[in-house]
Amino acid sequence: MLKILIPTLFLLPTTWLTSSKWLWPTALTQSMLIALGSITWLNNTTDTGWTALNSYIGTDPLSTPLLVLSCWLLPLMLLASQNHLSSEPMNRQRMYITLLATLQLFLILAFGATEMIMFYVMFEATLIPTLLVITRWGNHTERLNAGTYFLFYTLAGSLPLLVALLMLQNNTGTLSLLIIPYAKPLLLMPFGSKIWWAACMIAFLVKMPLYGMHLWLPKAHVEAPVAGSMVLAAVLLKLGGYGMMRLMIVLDPLSKEMVYPFIVLALWGVIITGSICLRQTDLKSLIAYSSVSHMGLVAGGILIQTPWGFTGALILMIAHGLASSALFCLANTNYERTHSRTMLLARGLQIALPLMTTWWFIASLANLALPPLPNLMGELMILTSLFNWSAWTLILTGIGTLITAAYSLYMFLMSQRGPLPQHMLALPPSYTREHLLMALHLIPLLLIILKPALLWGWFA
């Protein structure tokens, strides 16, 4: 654990002490070394599952894949942001890298926390760097509005969680994840325990986001700079799913009745947000709504609480993190060339940038869950566990899968095929940096096919 935490901490002085000429190469090299070092985590699962640094920080098979994903994403964010920050003053570039490094630090501490309150504090702390990145480096004036939505949705959702955790602490005397699965269930007034259950879940359902609490997400995604979109889609949404999995153990026997409305909402959301995607003209907005749709499946899988549901949810979270982050990078490469996110104004790019079309194709196929990609493994496991619970869910999930395929292909065809508009005849070529960025997103996704057991979490 320390071999990752200490270099991440030292990224901050590195950023401020390096000469301006070497700023990006050094930050990138150090973060890439951290990312490569974090892969060793996948190797050392102990018999109990927990590998603890001290009584507050440790890893287990559930948090390890998410930790590796968080570390893997920092160098990719730096690679993606290099171009659009090159015109900014040096101190602002340093500030930007500092914010991304602190965000990674908070994420490592959130996923590594074995104490519920520490997880809560880090869960909230990730808000600050993200908010600053969105409101300071976003592309349009609506970014302030988006930042406000992001802040207030998340804070309003997570205040009840704090109260619920304090009540749990009062009743059981501990909030350690190592002990709390063995504690007695919390018994409150007949209705009080139901409110307590909802308070525990709402914060994570807003973060995921569940359909109905998702309004902050498209706004935040569309207005954020590329690194903001990447980390939001790839890791911050996964904090919600991770928190739900951690708390689900404590919430039995209440969950049996309480999960029904949320599963219905999640599956309904898969269909509705998919349909919204079919009507989008804005590229980033389409990818953002597709995130809501995928996370709806994840929420359904977790709320079913079967081994298959949990495993499928974890696989889909990791796979979706890589695929949607790749799509945001591609949308950004388009935006940097055409200065427009509208799909009608930037089509026919296959003629101008043929190699980028290959990346678009692979990322779109990953998004629509083509076999044998891990996206399909996750979706199949979730569909099976939902079908096992009630056969009727197959109708909803089937329609959802169909719509996902439809909007993924629609996005690919709209942006890549067709005639090249007149105003786009002289585009700059694609850079090696962008190809490296896409390769580092999609190669891990393809390698997971060979050993999916790394992502099976508790049930490997």
UniProtKB/Swiss-Prot annotation:
Annotated compartments: Mitochondrion membrane
GO molecular function (one): NADH dehydrogenase (ubiquinone) activity
Catalysis: reaction(s): a ubiquinone + NADH + 5 H(+)(in) = a ubiquinol + NAD(+) + 4 H(+)(out)
Species, as recorded: Gadus morhua (Atlantic cod)
Function, as annotated: Core subunit of the mitochondrial membrane respiratory chain NADH dehydrogenase (Complex I) that is believed to belong to the minimal assembly required for catalysis. Complex I functions in the transfer of electrons from NADH to the respiratory chain. The immediate electron acceptor for the enzyme is believed to be ubiquinone.
GO annotations of cellular component type: mitochondrial membrane
Main localization category: mitochondrion
Keyword Mitochondrion attached: yes
Pfam families: Oxidored_q5_N, Proton_antipo_M
Enzyme Commission identifier(s): 7.1.1.2
Protein name according to UniProt: NADH-ubiquinone oxidoreductase chain 4
UniProt topology in membrane: Multi-pass membrane protein
Name of the gene: MT-ND4
NCBIfam families, alphabetized: NDH_I_M
